[in-house]
């Protein structure tokens, strides 16, 4: 396996190398660095620098594909400090090989304000589109699938949405597998609740990012035959009658007991100078999602099963 880890501080690189060189499964260690970083730091022994512009760009993904000759690549997708377990890479590789998945991600621990907390992630579901789906920082990807992604003749170039576009591509060509084991730790830099984070897309500062995400999503929907051509639909007549609510927030869920309360509370807490409601579509969840929704009370909250 080849490792590709973002690096902003040379001490972090040295610390990672001291641990990773103990792994017999590691073929090459590459640090993703800026041109300025590379110009001011000597490359430590036992690794290489791969100069990138930003972690989420197409140039970075292409550079990763160009610099690997292993069967699998491990990409750290965030600027964070990773705590490697004794068998982190071995478990990723064993499960990737056993399942023949194009991508494997795992449960992990998070260091939040000096406290280590378990951070289980959820199973990836077919059709999932959220660009902020929590895979954790470490993605173990089949190298051939990565090469095939880069080789697509119609592949778009992105500054912000390349990791998202890669994940959507992988979901089309193979299985994205959730390894239900706590295999590593990472530092949590954003301590907001998940329900608060998911409204980042409405922040004007994220406009360019969101435009690229929407473009990648639209192209993905077209490739899986799920893109809706709205030209065939009647335009609603909003003057036909009085509507009690000006807008509705629709939240579809299935087995989301860990996050549904935060998401609904965040939606209900939005400030607006007009009336709106929140409609949660519960797709017959088999966990406590329905019970949690039943406990949430608000005049403008509707649950549909």
Give short role names for the model-derived ranges.
Residues 64, 69-84:
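Short beta-strand-to-loop acidic/aromatic patch adjacent to the donor-nucleotide binding site
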Residues 15-28, 265-275:
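Short, acidic, metal-binding catalytic loop of nucleotide-sugar glycosyltransferases
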Residues 145, 156-182, 217:
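A short, conserved alpha-helix in the catalytic core of glycosyltransferases
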Residues 33-41, 81, 282-291:
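A conserved acidic beta->alpha catalytic loop
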């Amino acid at each position: 396996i080849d490792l590709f880890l973002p690096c902003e501080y040379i001490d972090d690189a040295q610390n990672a190398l001291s641990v990773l060189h103990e792994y017999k499964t590691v073929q090459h260690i590459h640090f993703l660095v800026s041109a300025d970083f590379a110009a001011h730091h000597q490359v430590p022994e036992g690794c290489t620098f791969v100069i990138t512009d930003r972690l989420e760009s197409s140039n970075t993904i292409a550079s990763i594909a160009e610099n690997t000759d292993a069967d699998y690549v491990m990409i750290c997708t965030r600027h964070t400090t990773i705590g490697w377990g004794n068998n982190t890479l071995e478990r990723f590789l064993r499960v990737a090989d056993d399942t023949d998945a194009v991508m494997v991600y795992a449960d992990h621990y998070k260091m939040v304000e000096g406290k280590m907390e378990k951070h289980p992630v959820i199973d990836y579901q077919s059709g999932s589109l959220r660009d902020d789906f929590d895979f954790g920082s470490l993605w173990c990807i089949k190298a051939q699938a990565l090469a095939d992604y880069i080789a697509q003749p119609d592949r778009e170039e992105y500054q912000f949405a390349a990791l998202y576009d890669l994940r959507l591509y992988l979901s089309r060509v193979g299985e994205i597998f959730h390894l239900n084991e706590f295999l590593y730790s990472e530092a949590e830099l954003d301590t907001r609740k998940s329900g608060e984070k998911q409204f980042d897309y409405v922040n004007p500062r994220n406009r360019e990012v969101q435009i690229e995400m929407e473009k990648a999503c639209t192209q993905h929907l077209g490739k899986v035959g799920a893109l809706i051509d709205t030209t065939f639909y009647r335009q609603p007549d909003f003057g036909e009658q009085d509507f009690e609510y000006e807008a509705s927030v629709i939240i579809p869920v299935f087995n989301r007991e860990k996050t549904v309360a935060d998401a609904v509370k965040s939606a209900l807490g939005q400030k607006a100078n007009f009336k709106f409601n929140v409609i949660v579509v519960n797709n017959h969840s088999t966990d406590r999602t329905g019970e949690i929704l039943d406990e949430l009370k608000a005049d403008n909250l509707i649950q549909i099963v």
